[in-house]
Amino acid sequence: MTLLTQSSTWQALSAHTQNLPHMRELFATDAARFKNMSLSACGLFLDYSKNRATAETLELLFSLAKDSQLEAKIKAMFAGEIINTTEKRAVLHTALRSKASQSIIAEGQDIVLEVQQTLSKMQEFVETVTSGQWKGYTGKAITDIVSIGIGGSFLGPKVVSQALRPYWNQGLNCHFVANVDGTSISEKLKLLDSETTLFIMSSKSFGTQETLTNTLTAKAWFLAKGGLQSDVAKHFVAVTSNVTKATEFGIDANNIFPMWDWVGGRYSLWSAIGLPIALLVGMDNFRALLNGAHQMDEHFASAPLAENMPVIMGLLSLWYGNFFNAQSHVVLTYDHYLRGLPAYFQQLDMESNGKSVTLDGTDVDYSTGPVIWGGEGTNGQHAYHQLIHQGTALIPADFIMPLQSHNPIGVHHDQLASNCFGQTQALMQGRTFEEALAELANSSLTDEEKQLIAKHKVMPGNKPSNTLLMNKLTPETLGALIALYEHRTFVQGAIWDINSFDQWGVELGKNLGNDVLARISAEQDSSALDASSNGLINLYRQGAI
């Protein structure tokens, strides 16, 4: 057993699961439950009263956090200590949204100064493009941005841009390309005019396979449409650490934005990786996004555990995963603009906490990262909500909704809100056999049929959920929301004593993919591989089954 599972607090939590009343009873016996189990921070409101938790549960979870030195680990991250121990790196995405007056030293340098310089450079670039001063090779202004990246350099900008659609600058559109499948970029290029398109290539090394392949394809398309090599600088910019490769490609050194080792890809949207966001919504709104995240950083760093929103959410998720065998967690966004958030949080959480050894290399004997999934309401209510209500697996849920819509048409938002709140109530309350039978009392069914159908209509309830509200979806509230989930992820990793900031599984996949590519192109013999891989490669070479 690990030290974590041997601890008296862990054992107490395990025993405590046997003594919890149904949530129906918890609400019936405590009129102040909603008031006592909700809080506001940074423009967000969290109702966590619909959880399988009592005051005793929370005290035990806070004790577990203290036993795990959570507060010290939070301070270590903000101080720039080397908490990514396997790669010997600080973890300072929080510095990207810090105030200009702050000073944070990493690798012997004040990185806040570097961040502010980059923001100033971004501002100048954004203003040049959005004002129409930036001209393409035929003298026309830019109308379309194509952001080429993969992982965090793709998903973050795409999801945030999608969420902030009401704030987009008129006359500018953005397209996102990530997958190396040629269909992805081909379909995008069909829509574009080479004279008015600007490509942003985001890759720390300027050599990431998918990103480089797509960028080379974009360049070939540009040249085929009439652009010259000397025109590339007018239509391609880069976010990269490899200035040499970028300039060799044809990008002007003045149009290369930096990336830093102390920022992981899945935490990078706050950096120059967020350039597509800034182009679409303007730098004022981009800075508001950063400010919302900064407010959540300050809340996370200073609020007591019992009043700390990321801590509470992280502990409750851990509670279900480690003590109720919940293998997944669903994120349900009741706002069309936020429909991409489940995929973003999926990458954030699963790439961070999909680990099986502790920091000292000991195999864990407890579940770590759950499967994160979800979608937008109310669509999911006619699909996978059925599994959450009556399936055999426990699936904790997060419901996210703005109180005010950007598009207040008729009764749409009232119906959306009623569905959101109704779902959380149904999950908590369920339906007993007696209630189901009573609903059938006036039907034409026989008594025997009523008994049978009632059994099918029973829902156990006691299904946990959090509800996150904001007044309105703005750059600031979105920044706070994303930072909330970043820190929630950190909380769990800190208690599990794992490294939430490396991704060796991703690296292995990259390496093996490159190896297979060499064998597909016949540069290497594939017969040395396992029979399955060799057989698949041979089928691919044949081009037919």
Swiss-Prot record:
It is found in: Cytoplasm. Its main location: cytoplasm. Keywords: Cytoplasm, Gluconeogenesis, Glycolysis, Isomerase. Its EC number is 5.3.1.9. The active site is at 351 (proton donor), 382, 510. Pfam families: PGI. GO terms for biological process: gluconeogenesis; glucose 6-phosphate metabolic process; glycolytic process. It comes from the Bacteria. The keyword Acetylation does not apply. One of its GO terms (cellular component) is cytosol. InterPro entries: G6P_Isomerase, G6P_Isomerase_C, Phosphoglucose_isomerase_CS, SIS_dom_sf, SIS_PGI_1, SIS_PGI_2. SUPFAM superfamilies: SIS domain. Transmembrane segments: none annotated. Pathway: Carbohydrate biosynthesis; gluconeogenesis; Carbohydrate degradation; glycolysis; D-glyceraldehyde 3-phosphate and glycerone phosphate from D-glucose: step 2/4. It catalyses: alpha-D-glucose 6-phosphate = beta-D-fructose 6-phosphate. GO terms for molecular function: carbohydrate derivative binding; glucose-6-phosphate isomerase activity; monosaccharide binding. Belongs to the GPI family. Catalyzes the reversible isomerization of glucose-6-phosphate to fructose-6-phosphate. HAMAP family: G6P_isomerase. This is Glucose-6-phosphate isomerase. It comes from Shewanella putrefaciens (strain CN-32 / ATCC BAA-453).
